[in-house]
């Protein structure tokens, strides 16, 4: 989770310090960006399979907390595991980056939040950037009756909420304004922030089961951990060596995530927003054109014929009625040349040749399937959320990221898919990273190092800064030279971020592509996401 905070005044020190409610924090000065960094600051304690607890440690001026290096990351599978990050249960920490006027030397790409802070100073709207670690997988989102009865479900969300509270209480010590906090990608209490940015992840588009639907997975994990006969199974798991528990958790084939527990999540979020039970703040949200590539790649199923695509849908959505699947197949024709984006392929098409060249499987209906799953997971939910937010009379700004950051030859990014405007492709542009520079671990694709994409990165970055600072992405330093990004309720349109190698291509599109198909996805969200749970109208 990221948060941005407007800066109230400039401040710096050769060894910067801040006095928080827990005492003195000492950071490090980064001369290449003229910034102060405070890294790995604990914001809560994380007892295993229990709710987060406030920090009870104090630091005095003579023995300050050393915030000169990143802290541990929370246990999770995939990128955290494969890319050499230091994982630990002691992981509830955050990082703060703020401007500090001083002269420096060459750039260091390690600090990927530094670019957006640097740009905010150039735009004369300085801000602080805060990134937050929170618990993941089973340790962050345990399911089953035992977890629900103990009140320890959705722990990762509770971590986020406590982090936001810590920021509210302490950000003034770092020069920030607690009344001007914008949350990016997270959910928390409404009194804690004044705006939100949601990219490629919304209130629908992912399974959100009830707690008891996770019981079989919990029982399997308990059995493999030799805790079946324990009177208190949770306490037994708390006492199990992590070296035993961690591989078990990753081997049982259960995707641990948020659950409808009747407590933190009392009902499906889509219905809460529909009924107006949400934090009423300005919202900036958007999707990438090729969001579905990651879903098809993750499925390991690459259809060549319509009956194979049918199997993919039936497997992915077992509660979806066959008549609905037939409707979807009709609305995503095999010959998708006129669709947006086009997805018509054959086995000998350049796409599949390029996929095979890097030892990735392919099928002639790969892009057709990706269009379906991309609409389900991102485009339909993004449109639905923009519509709901606008109906509440709230400022809503919707975007569509179309720039292909990579193309053919294929560059495969583990966990994301084969390039193009795929899931995560916009991240380097939002952060304002220069062309060719990505995150320190090179997990997400870098901004393309050509003039058109460098201009695109700067434009997205400054729009994000304006939204954080002014709650309006049009409040730019040179706004008269820029295309107007209209609110969704006045235009039903998306602001399109696109570029060729040579030229920036900003424009506005009517938000009606694949409208009928997207509506079917949203009409059936109770069956795709909520296990046939259809809440009562209120």
Briefly describe each language-model feature range.
Residues 40, 75-234, 263-299, 455, ...:
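Serine-hydrolase-like catalytic core of hydrolytic proteins
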Residues 117, 161-164, 168, 218-222, ...:
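Non-transmembrane alpha-helical segments in soluble domains
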Residues 19, 29-32, 85-89, 121-124, ...:
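Extracellular/periplasmic catalytic domains that process cell-envelope and extracellular macromolecules
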Residues 248-451:
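Substrate-gating cap/lid region and adjacent catalytic-acid/histidine neighborhood
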Residues 234-253:
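Polar, glycine-rich mid-to-C-terminal structural blocks
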Residues 22, 56, 72, 112, ...:
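N-linked glycosylation sites
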Residues 444-538:
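Alpha/beta-hydrolase-fold serine-hydrolase catalytic core, especially in secreted/extracellular enzymes
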Residues 5-102, 243, 534-537:
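Catalytic-loop region of hydrolases
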